[in-house]
């Protein structure tokens, strides 16, 4: 049986070094790198990282922007048209992420409490940036 429920499939982030970006997301958030070997072999245009069974982040090199033709003006989106993306973690993984970022001296926002999201009010959340300036929000609900 096929589940045709509407859901998020992927988000594309512009990055300067897709391989380094994949490593960042793997090391800090535990996202599984996909197609990195194929990207370095130049058989695919970009690698991705798997967030969960149904959702991925595509890590598109900024150099690809000039070839974007699917929508007028798409090539101009190589700036930062995405405000931020949010990942929901367990409380344990949330604390572990914050510790990993702190160990690497990656700047983070203060903790917020009760921020609204897809599953209601989060117990805690915070923001940090990836090496390309994309803003990531981490949160947990339980």
Q: Model-found features: residue ranges?
A:
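N-terminal beta-strand motif that seeds the catalytic metal site of vicinal oxygen chelate
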Residues: 1-22, 82-85, 89, 139-142
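Vicinal oxygen chelate
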Residues: 3-4, 98-142
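Core segments of cupin and vicinal oxygen chelate
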Residues: 13-64
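Short, conserved charged micro-motifs
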Residues: 20, 92-97
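A short, acidic/glycine-rich surface segment
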Residues: 35, 66-72, 111, 115, ...
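Exposed loop/turn and edge beta-strand positions of beta-sandwich/beta-sheet ligand-binding modules
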Residues: 43-45, 83, 122
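Helix-adjacent hinge/juxtasegments
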Residues: 60-88
């Amino acid at each position: 049986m096929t589940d045709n429920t509407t859901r998020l499939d992927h988000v594309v982030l512009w990055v300067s070094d897709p391989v380094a970006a994949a490593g960042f997301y793997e090391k800090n958030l535990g996202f599984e790198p996909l197609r990195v070997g194929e990207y370095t072999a130049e058989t695919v245009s970009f690698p991705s990282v798997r967030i969960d069974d149904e959702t991925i982040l595509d890590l598109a090199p900024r150099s690809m922007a000039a070839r974007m033709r699917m929508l007028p003006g798409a090539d101009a989106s190589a700036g930062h048209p995405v405000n931020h993306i949010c990942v929901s973690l367990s409380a344990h993984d949330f604390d572990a992420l914050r510790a990993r970022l702190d160990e690497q001296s990656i700047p983070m926002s203060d903790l917020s409490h009760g921020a609204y999201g897809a599953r209601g009010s989060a117990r805690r959340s915070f923001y940090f940036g990836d090496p390309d300036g994309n803003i990531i929000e981490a949160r947990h609900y339980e």
